[in-house]
Amino acid sequence: MLASKLYAPTLRDDPAEADVASHKLMLKAGMLRKNAAGLYSFLPLGRKVCLKVENIIRKEMNRSGAQEVMMPIVQPAEIWRETGRWDVYGPEMFKLKDRHDNEYCLGPTHEELITTLVRNELRSYKQLPVNLWQMQNKYRDEIRPRFGLMRSREFVMKDAYSFDVDREGMIKSYETMYDAYSRIFTECGIEYRPVLADSGQIGGNYSHEFMALAKAGEADVVICTKCGFAANVEKAVPNTLISEDEELHEAELFETPECATIQDLVEQVKVPIEKTIKAVAFDIDGKLVLTMVRGDHEVNDVAVQNLVGGNDVQTASPELLRAHGLEPGYMSPLNAGPQNDDFVILVDETAMQIKNGVTGANKHGYHYRYVTPARDFKDVKTATIRLITEQDVCPECGGEVKLTQGIEVGQVFGLGTKYSESLNATFLDKDGKAKPFVMGCYGIGVTRTVAATIEQLHDDKGIIWPVATAPFEAVVLPVNMKDEAIVSVAKKLYDELLDLDVDVLLDDRDERAGVKFNDADLIGYPVRLTVGSKATEGKVEVKIRRTDEEEEVTIEGVAEHVARLLRDLRKKHL
């Protein structure tokens, strides 16, 4: 490819709309352009990167025995109604009607469609197991699209679905996909960790997320420094912290003007934060759920939803709170209205251990002190509903844990029979009895993997692509297009690299050398061959983008040298 023919409109200034490195650099490098909120066009360089990621995925899917299909983006509403997810999925689902008033959605995922696709075709246990996968656009109407490709309304996803005769078979399929995903992300050259995860709206109770570790990640991950345990913080179950014994006092009401937050209490009343008991209230499908945690802890809303059930989780309104005797800013179980089917109180196990603590009185400007929840909170439900912190220990081995950020680039789910039962998708077993398929599903965010790679691998000059996913593996850069000797050597090297199957770009633009160097660093080609004044002496410069290593190499044999260098870098996943 010649740079003079390449459509790659680079930008000199940082785009104001970009909040994270991947978004900024893909716009600057001429890989991506925004069309509307959460909607992007991939330009040739960006599309090449996506295709390289897709080809790595395709190779490993074929190796695993999965078979590629393609299903429609537009899906009929009735199959989503069969599983009950038409209303459950919420406003993130794009819904539409055709001219005949039939309802459809733009697929956010394809569990329903794939299950209906096989339910009348796979009839016998002899046809199983089967794993079908596709590379397809997905659509989710994000309330706040942001961070470029990391949270967009349209994205490319690889999704696979396995069908087995029993749970043992499903676990085997799950492990096959888990191993394939590990190979995929290793070859893509990103630092990742598989972590235990919640299944969310997909369902099932067996799941791992593949997290690309990056500061820009929206997910919090806990990792044990001793045994290697790793989990999404929503899935990690912290231990109950036991408070030290002390003499108990009777709870007493006291005035706390302008103390509507935990921080206000700490600063004005001078109470230690671990002695405060914080209230967070949710509206879950119209049910009021009051949760209580220690003041320095955060509520795990996923754990709360898993305990209570329901689909639509919102912050409770002041009107709903007051209808149940709760005063916003001063809430607690004390003086609250009676619990019933529409009102439940959940207290975290660690909060229940507090002695002589401070919590709200459900009266504006007042709190109770010397509160001991185990004694004073009546008829409440207790459970572990807080997020793990670095002050906790590993739930597996008791070792030290660290929190870090991650970008979810893939997830594997053991679905069980959730979809096959609701969609009446069955096969005949060895005894001729109808049984529901035991399913798994497995997703990789292709475009998100591209963004995650940049989040991990960039510097102040631009992107640092691994060889496996770079838009071009190497660039030949003649510094002066008016010097015939330089141009002749550059074209010769370019042709030799093409003959060696190197994916190479010749920067034949009539631009200053500095402009070409800046663009090469911005776009992030792994290897740069600079053809300059020493070309007449039979020498060119070879530079590795990742390490900034430079070396002068004789022109004779330089193409073979670069090809070997690229092979070595790729073997090391660099």
Describe the predicted segments one by one:
Residues 1-98, 110, 161-200, 297:
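TRNA-binding/sensing appendages of the translation machinery
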Residues 75-79, 320-321, 508-515:
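Short acidic loop-to-helix transition motifs that present clustered carboxylates
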Residues 87-104, 212-223:
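Acidic, His- and aromatic-enriched active-site or binding-groove loops in soluble protein domains
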Residues 99-133:
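Hydrophobic alpha-helical hairpins/lids featuring a short glycine-rich hinge
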Residues 111-119, 144-158, 168-442, 446:
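Extended, low-hydrophobicity, polar/charged segments
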Residues 265, 440-468, 473:
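C-terminal, non-catalytic macromolecule-binding modules
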Residues 462-516:
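Generic long, charged, amphipathic alpha-helical segments
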Residues 493-561:
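C-terminal structured "cap/appendage" subdomains that terminate the fold
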